Amino acid sequence: MSNLFATEVVDASVRQRAAARFRQVGVRLPKLSELARPETIEAPLRAALDAVDPDSADPRNLFRVHWHNGIDRRTQTVVPCHLVLPEALTGVRAKIIVALGDRFPMIAAHKVLAAYGCLVPRLVTGQFDLDNQRAVWPSTGKYCLGGV
C-alpha cells in the first residue's frame, strides 16, 4: 500500500505563505486528531462555537466537521448518532449500523470532511499554493449551487 500523502514538508516557502495568510485573516485550522477526537478541542474554542451558526460559511465551523455533532449540530455527543438496523429489516443476523451524516456543518453532509481531509495535508506540507492554485470541492448536492 502506498502513502498517498507526503509526510515531510515539500515546499517550505509555500507552507510559510499559507500559514501567514491564515494568521492574517485569523483562521486556525483544526488538526485531524481534533476531528477524530473532538473532545480534545480546547474548551475556549468549543465555547466560541456557540456563537457560530452551523450553516454559516465561517471557518470556525471546520471544528464541527466530525461525526460527534448532536442533533442541534452545535453540541457534541460521546457516541456519533447512528441507527442499528434490526434483523427483521435486513434479513441478516449481523448488526448493520448506519452512521448519520446530517449533523455536519454548512451543508448538513459529511462531504465537507472528505474535502478537508484531502486539502489540509497539502496545506501543511506546502503542496497547495493559495496564491497560484484553486481548490476543487465536492458538490453540495444542492442542485449545483456551489461549495463552501
Language model segments and positions:
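PLP-dependent amino-acid enzyme catalytic core
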Residues: M1-V148
